[in-house]
C-alpha cells in the first residue's frame, strides 16, 4: 500500500496545525501530496445587494486569512499541496473530497476550535471517522 495522497482539513485550531505539521513530515517520507481543505459556513442568501457581496467578500477574506499559516507551513517545508475552500458542512465535504480524489488518508486534528462538543473527539472528527472512504489519522 502506497500512501501518496492526503487530505488535511483545517479550521485554525492548534489541533489542525499539528495535523498539518504531521502531514508535511509524512509527505517527506512518501513523496506525497496534500489537499488542504477549509469549509466555511454557507453564504447568507437572504441578504440583498450590496450586502450579499459584502458578506461573500468578508467570508472569503476570513477563509484566506485562516488558511494562510498552513500555506506558509507547506511552502516552507517544500510540501506539494493544493487547497480548497468549500461552502459545505465540514464532515460531508471532507469525505466527499476524499472519495472523489481517491485519497489514501485523511489526517486531521482530534478537536476543532469548539472544545465543548464531544467527549474525547470533536464532533467533526467523529463524523469523519464514521463516514470516511479511507483511513483517518487523528492527531492530538
What role is predicted for each listed range?
Residues 1, 72-106:
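Structural beta-alpha unit
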Residues 2-50, 73, 77:
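Small/aliphatic-rich secondary-structure junction motif
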Residues 25, 96-140:
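Gly/Ser-rich helix-loop-strand patches that form or flank binding pockets
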Residues 35, 82, 137:
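Conserved beta-strand positions in the Rossmann-like core of class I SAM-dependent methyltransferases
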Residues 43-44, 91, 115:
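Generic structural signal for helix capping and beta-alpha/helix-loop junctions
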Residues 53-65:
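A short acidic, glycine-rich active-site loop
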Residues 67-71:
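A conserved short alpha-helical segment within the catalytic HATPase_c
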Amino acid at each position: 500500500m502506497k500512501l501518496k495522497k492526503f487530505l488535511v482539513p483545517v479550521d485554525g485550531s492548534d489541533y489542525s496545525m499539528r495535523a498539518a505539521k504531521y502531514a508535511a513530515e509524512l509527505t517527506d517520507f512518501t513523496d506525497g501530496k496534500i489537499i488542504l481543505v477549509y469549509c466555511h459556513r454557507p453564504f447568507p442568501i437572504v441578504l440583498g445587494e450590496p450586502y450579499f457581496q459584502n458578506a461573500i467578500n468578508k467570508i472569503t477574506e476570513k477563509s484566506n486569512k485562516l488558511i494562510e499559516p498552513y500555506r506558509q507551513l507547506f511552502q516552507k517545508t517544500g510540501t506539494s499541496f493544493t487547497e480548497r475552500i468549500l461552502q459545505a458542512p465540514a464532515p460531508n465535504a471532507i469525505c466527499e473530497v476524499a472519495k472523489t480524489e481517491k485519497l489514501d488518508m485523511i489526517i486531521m486534528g482530534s478537536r476543532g476550535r469548539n472544545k465543548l462538543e464531544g467527549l474525547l473527539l470533536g464532533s467533526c472528527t467523529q463524523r469523519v471517522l464514521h463516514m470516511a472512504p479511507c483511513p483517518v489519522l487523528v492527531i492530538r
